[in-house]
């Protein structure tokens, strides 16, 4: 749709659907009230959130990049990558505050709904802000020159170069980012709580600090990609993740065990945070240039569909299934670390493929 009717209309549709679905979760009836319809409604709303988020991520990347111009494009567009960690940070803070002021019974009864109610305010602000946005200059030029494609997705699959770049985006950039996001932002907390048995409050504190560290690291990676190119930065992040994941989680277990043995000593916590920050570096190197790369890889007339499809497939197939695969391997091998070989091998393979085939796009014109 973004290649046919414009970047801005799709931008408006996705935020409206996502916001309404999120707000509705906060008003869902319980199983005791409506029975089986409660989980059915929840799954339906989650699917709607997923579908709208799919259009949002690729569409916002194209929209922002086409407005960014040619100078410091990587740095300007890297701000978009902060939104995911920022959401995790605010949700963690909300839950921490609610748990602090509410009893466990109150939180289970209605407290969990509060973040979903608050999202109504965010939805109103987002819709008003986006109504003031302008269509991208690239799409306006396409419309004036009658270069728009009626079947952009079909055109993408017919063009050999576009097909190749869609695969590279899927396998190396988007899947690599999804794998690292899971390992750095999601699995570290699960691992520290379930395997190491650290107190949830301590884990939440560590997660907040590591997420805060991710913000400047991501912006720096985007800026650095403007200086040395997107390709070397992305490959560095993939390689660093492949090398560092296994030893990092082993260090997390060792340091966490030391902390449990002497909880009044802060040194293990400081080193735990350093390990988490090291993992954040690998994630930042991949996602920092990612927004610009999504748009720069493809021609303007089919850019939105060419960037959105592989990016969403990578998030769903690779990122979405990663927790299941890691957990299954851990159970089969009876180890807390065995499953981590899957993301390690995936990242190493992605780095090799990117080194061999990923083109440098830093100086590409977005009007072509």
PLM features: residue spans?
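Extracytoplasmic gate region of multi-pass secondary transporters
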Residues: 162-214, 318-323
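Flexible cytoplasmic inter-helical loops of multi-pass small-molecule transporters
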Residues: 131-152, 364-368
